[in-house]
């Protein structure tokens, strides 16, 4: 199954999405801000990114723009 990176500063949302995806058989990787998401993407294979738009440090839009410079993976913005 696919590796899915879930990124949101709200840990409850990350956990809820993660539980659902894991029940469906996906491997879930968790990040809690845009900087952490970029670091994860540089260090391990990810097939899909689900990212929140409003986060501290680096918001979802700016993180997505930086990620797109290096990685063409599919992204779902919440």
Task: Locate the predicted segments by residue.
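Active-site residues of response regulator receiver
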Residues: 8, 52
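Non-catalytic signal-transmission and effector/linker regions of two-component phosphorelay proteins
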Residues: 1-5
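Active-site beta3 strand of CheY-like receiver
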Residues: 44-50
